[in-house]
Amino acid sequence: MHKGFDFYKYKVVGSTNDVCFEKIKNKKSKVVIFAEEQTAGRGRNNKKWQSPKGNISYSFGFKNKQTLKALSLQAGLCVRDCLKEIYSVDVKLKWPNDLIFKSKKIGGILIESKTFGMQKHTVIGVGINLKIKSEESHWGDINKKQEYKKIENFILLLTNRLINIADGKFNVGWTNDWLNNCVHMNEDIQIENTKEKLKFIGLGENGELIGLKNGVHHKIVESSIKVEGLY
């Protein structure tokens, strides 16, 4: 299973991303971390991400050999495709890093980078709710029980695709695939940090959000967005 990367499985960790950084700084190979439970998970902007036992907490770490653009979007597309193949669920994508199923967030992507010595390292963190308690209704899940064989297949498939991203070999037509699976294509959205309302119409060459307002195109590089009707 572990050709081309070192794999570590844990019962419980604080953060799979933190563990991944500790491992990758002393490794020549790529590193994958999987935990059955994560007690101090986080999302973008240090938001807390609950990762109780029975879900997927995963991190993929590598040494940067080149500048990688739109990494969060590409990783999200990989996760979406792997969930479709392994679990037969049609998950949608929300810019820039959320996974949506039945109008609720069921997971997300967190990209973090650190420099050790002169070498930049990047970790792609992935959190996915397989099945959560019904009282946590503000989150969604894909309503699948934890079966380690399926999780193992998912990890292998996802890791091989993330290796392609890390090595600069990702599908050149990925933006069309991403847009075809976007949950808010041609929908009105709100930019969280400015409260500006735009119509989402596409992506820039580096993964920027392209919005339309009063006939003028706007490019958003960094923010979260709100979409009416989603969680």
PLM regions with names:
Residues 7-9, 95, 129-131:
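Active-site proximal loop and beta-alpha junction motif in alpha/beta enzyme cores
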Residues 11, 93-95, 172:
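Short loop/edge segments at beta-strand edges and connector loops
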Residues 2-3, 65-67, 73-91, 101-231:
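Long, positively charged amphipathic alpha-helical accessory segments at protein N-termini or as interdomain linkers
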Residues 1-86, 115:
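N-terminal lobe of the biotin/lipoate ligase/transferase fold
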